[in-house]
A protein has these predicted regions:
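Extracellular/periplasmic, surface-exposed regions of secreted and cell-surface proteins
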Residues: 3, 31-36, 77-78, 210, ...
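Residues within well-ordered beta-strands of beta-sheet-rich folds
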Residues: 126-128, 598, 652, 790-794, ...
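Surface-exposed, extracytoplasmic segments of Gram-negative outer-membrane nutrient-acquisition systems
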Residues: 186-190, 376-383, 389, 565-578, ...
């Protein structure tokens, strides 16, 4: 198979048997067995060393790819995407129908990625779409209908448990009696028969989705063509949420004569996304959508229908404005539109035999529009006097336009003589990127019926705009040589000049080299080890770069604000300008040095294939948002400081287990180990802390710490040692006959007046008092290893595909439990049902803090959980109709299939899904707060070719 398999290596293709670098290829047959709108969703666990994550399970293009560990701390860790030869720093895979993709190749080591120089440090994803073939037109239809639902939701308290909790918080006196003892429910026990509202039942739905793709491919004379149209309608499992995409693609290849060939590729996609923003950076937890879903009380003491209530009047709305989540989903208008256009045109001319000149030009445009409208039936549009978040009827419009222009010119030469095989390529590239952003926000719109058209009908409009541009000029070359397909050498060099840096630092040079020895082709091995069908040793070393910073970060920035920066002059205020950032003309790209040692083995005529790679990837001159001396006038600046190292082992095993006339069974297994270590930070800086913006109580409390000598982004807080028990106290009786508990001497405390049931944190310093000095590492969001396991079974006309995915050794900071298993003294807020096992005088051995607990609003190991999981990700069962059945219908092939996704998960994580990270970054991995749930889905599909 390796004899004919071709792999994209950037500016060319190479037979897999001749590879000297580390390149992983996706099995497109496996990836398209389950219908998805974005192929990235199916990549996780398929290729060793490639980690695919999403913040949550919401519909849309929210996927992140990290190759061989995060190569930056505060910079981007995303790979470079090259789609049909057009390089882009942002993924365009959401605009391509998976059925249009021919291959996906992942360049991992420096030998492979150095050809992309300053943008190759995080790896390269090369996507090649399907091209036209010779022969008469062939029409193919792919369609499916999908049903999705939420299988695993957290259980919340019922009416009785909720009211019992309120009694503990309020006491049994007048406040509780006034709020919860009513004519309808005269006693606490009466709530056993009360109607309990689980708001999840009202905001989740069974989502019905469908997608359709039709393509035509063939040739007419010397013109080869393929064209396709697709429509995808994906409903979200939260009401009023979903994504629709309209997409079209055309690929043309015209052979003008024996020397000249012209290619054209064009793709257009329009994507529309609706639905609430479930999780995002915010200063108040009450603005998170799932907060209202889980916290809204489950019972009405008066028997009124809570579904008709706009807000919960039982809470202090100046601190916790809890809005009806059903009305939020129904009435908040959230409409995002993305229009993406990409086309490439290229001409290849053979100057003399084996010497070819290729000239390409490309253009990409991305227009994005975000519309938000909040009427009177929404959180911020409602004018309740206690609603401190009210802006009246309000609207927001954000629009961005991004353009990219590309010209690339390559000259390639190939020579094969006797046992010598030589290939050389030289090239130059020019790319220009422009962006224009503008937004307007207005409040107190006079007439709600105007909708988004009322932007000019409000008061206090806030208008923002920005414009940017960057350019990249590059020269590059590569030489491949092998002798007798046994001894290989590859050398690559790229020089990049970027406008993102000052003139003295604009050019960077990125060399790489690799060697390989195909020892199984040596006669002394081939003659004595016939069972060894392939054996190759690979070694590579090289440098790549990362230039993912702003267009003008090396410059000092001036800003102005009429309200903040002004001074009196001649009796009136004149706007003032201030520096918002520090100039740094020494700024340059991050440089990543990578060493890779690989071994490829094949046994029994290719029935068993094993690939292993060990790598050490060191990034220096990190583009770090570093703390600087206050005497500079700034608190931080973007500097080239620090060093980060990733090292690991990747193993891929592919086997043909059984192969007979009627039955075959193939397996593919991959596992990747990665160790991340910070070698250095800013001069004299032993660590850096990171904060999560999700609530005011925690915005000044570090949640993560990154220490020199350890991996980045470890969870930070107190070690939780359970709750204080009665035996920790001396008990006395006061003059009123009330029991008084005083901590015994020598038992450390965090809050004065600690009582039984309060959280107990470990005194690491031994000072006898718990304080910030006792905080330490309490978890690690980075997995020890990740992987996947695929099985393909074929029996006669039936095919079965089963795919497992896993992650092991990573922790999750479950912020949902920090709120919903920790009410402290907060009234009228529902909790997870797990909180019924809290500490109470009747349950004094519980390690869950009591109601009204003191000192509980802290990051601690109580809320850090093992996020390891083994997931049965996909199953697909298909039937291929026999040709004799289809021939009378003029159909050449047809397959009907049933598939399921996110079927079952083995995990110790208490949340709805361990595959979550709502604040995903190298410094804050594994944070779970108010996620959009990941749906279980079943699809019925049809593939037909005419």
């Amino acid at each position: 198979m390796e004899e004919v398999t071709v792999v994209a290596v950037g500016y060319g293709d190479v037979r897999r048997r001749d590879l000297t670098g580390s390149i992983g290829s996706a099995n497109m047959g496996d990836l398209t067995k389950t219908p998805v709108s974005n192929i990235t969703e199916s990549l996780g666990g398929r290729i060793a060393g490639v980690q695919v994550s999403s913040g949550d399970g919401g519909p849309g293009d929210n996927f992140n790819i990290v190759i061989r560990g995060a190569g930056s701390l505060t910079g981007s860790t995303a790979p470079l995407y090259v789609i049909d030869g057009f390089p882009s720093e942002s993924s365009g895979l959401g605009s391509i129908n998976p059925n249009d993709i021919e291959s996906i190749d992942i360049l991992k080591d420096a030998s492979a990625t150095a050809i992309y120089g300053a943008r190759g440090a995080n790896g390269v994803v090369i996507v090649t779409t399907k091209k036209g073939g010779a022969g008469k037109p062939t029409i193919t239809y792919n369609g499916s209908v999908k049903v999705g639902l939420v299988k695993n939701t957290p259980e919340v308290m019922n009416a009785y448990d909720f009211v019992m909790l309120q009694q503990e918080i309020m006491g049994s006196g007048e406040e509780f009696q006034k709020n919860y003892i009513t004519e309808l429910y005269p006693t606490l026990d009466a709530y056993h028969n009360a109607q309990s509202y689980d708001w999840q039942d009202y905001i989740y739905r069974t989502a019905l989705s469908h997608n359709h793709h039709i393509s035509m491919t063939g040739s007419q004379g010397d013109l080869k063509y393929t064209t396709s149209l697709s429509y995808d309608d994906t409903q979200g499992v939260i009401i009023n949420s979903g994504v629709k995409r309209y997409q079209g693609r055309v690929n043309l290849s015209q052979k003008v004569n024996n020397k000249l060939k012209i290619d054209f590729t064009g793709n257009y996609a329009s994507t529309v996304q609706d639905g609430p923003t479930v999780s995002g950076a915010t200063s108040s937890m009450s603005t998170a959508y799932m907060y209202s879903v889980w916290s809204f009380r489950p019972v009405s003491p008066t028997g009124s229908d809570l579904l008709n209530q706009m807000y919960d009047e039982g809470v202090n709305m100046s601190e916790d404005y809890r809005f009806n989540p059903v009305k939020s989903a129904q009435n908040e208008y959230r409409h995002k539109t993305t229009n993406n256009l990409q086309f490439n045109i290229g001409a290849e001319y053979e100057i003399i035999k084996k010497l070819k000149l290729k000239v390409t030009a490309g253009y990409t445009s991305t227009d994005y529009k975000n519309e938000e409208f909040n009427g009177s039936q929404t959180r911020t549009g409602n004018s309740h006097p206690s609603n401190t978040q009210s802006k009246g009827i309000n609207a927001y419009l954000y629009q961005s336009e991004a353009r990219s222009y590309l010209n690339e010119n390559t000259l390639s030469y190939q020579l094969n003589k006797n046992s010598h095989n030589f290939n050389a390529m030289l090239g130059m590239s020019v790319q220009k990127n422009t962006s224009y952003i503008h937004s307007i926000r207005t409040e107190k719109i006079s007439n709600e019926s105007f909708g988004m058209a009322g932007l000019d009908k409000g008061s206090t409009p806030a208008v923002n705009s920005s414009k940017g541009e960057n350019k990249l000029m590059s020269y590059f070359g590569r030489i491949n040589y092998n002798y007798d397909s046994r001894y290989y050498i590859t050398a690559t060099m790229r020089a990049d000049g970027s406008s993102k840096f000052a003139r003295g630092n604009r050019w960077g040079y990125f060399p790489s080299g690799s060697l390989a020895w195909a020892f199984a082709r040596e006669s002394f091995i081939a003659e004595n080890a016939s069972w060894l069908s392939n054996g190759k040793l690979r070694f590579s070393y090289g440098q790549t770069g990362n230039n993912r910073i702003g267009n003008y970060d090396y410059m000092a920035h001036l800003i102005t604000d009429d309200d903040l920066y002004k001074y009196p002059w001649n009796g009136q205020f004149v706007p003032g300008y201030v520096l918002s950032s520090m100039q740094n003309e020494k700024l340059k790209w991050e440089t990543t040095e990578q060493l890779d040692l690989g071994l490829d083995l094949g046994f029994l005529d290719g029935r068993i294939n094993l690939n292993m790679d060990y790598y050490i990837k060191t990034t220096k001159d990190l583009l770090l948002d570093a703390d600087i001396s206050a005497s500079s006038g700034f608190s931080s600046a973007t500097l080239n400081v620090g060093k980060l190292r990733n090292s690991g082992l990747e193993i891929t095993l592919e086997t043909t287990n059984i192969k007979t006339k009627d039955f075959s069974w193939n397996s593919s297994f991959n596992i990747a180990f990665n160790k991340n270590e910070i070698i250095a930070l800013n001069s004299g800086q032993p660590y850096m802390t990171s904060y999560i913006s999700w609530d005011n109580k925690y915005k000044t409390t570090p949640a993560y710490i990154s220490k020199v000598g350890e991996s980045a982004g470890k969870m930070y807080g107190f070690i939780y040692d359970g709750t204080y028990k009665y035996e920790d106290f001396n008990k006395t009786i006061d003059e009123n006959g009330k029991e008084v508990y005083t901590l015994k001497e020598g038992i450390p405390y965090y809050v004065a007046g600690t009582q039984p049931g309060d959280p107990k944190y470990r005194d690491l310093t031994g000072e006898g008092e718990i304080n910030d000095k006792d905080k330490t590492t309490i978890g690690n969001g980075q997995p020890k290893h990740i992987g996947g396991f695929t099985n393909n079974l074929v029996w006669k006309n039936f095919d079965l595909n089963i795919f497992f995915q896993w992650s092991y050794g990573n922790d999750i900071l479950n912020a949902n439990r920090m709120v919903f298993e920790n009410p402290a003294a907060k009234q009228n807020t529902n909790m997870f049902a797990a909180y019924t096992n809290r500490w109470t005088p009747e349950n004094p051995t519980s390690n869950i803090p009591r109601a009204r607990a003191q000192g509980s609003n802290e990051y601690s190991s109580l809320y850090v959980e093992d996020g390891s999981f083994l997931k049965l990700k996909n199953i697909s069962l298909g039937y291929n109709f026999e040709a004799k059945t289809l021939k009378p219908l003029h159909i050449s092939s047809a397959r009907v299939y049933l598939s399921a996704e996110n079927i079952a998960t083995i995990s110790g994580y208490s949340g709805s899904d361990p595959e979550v990270s709502t604040r995903n970054s190298p410094l804050t991995p594994g944070f779970d707060w108010s996620p959009y749930p990941r749906a279980f889905s079943m699809s019925l599909g049809l593939n037909v070719t005419f």
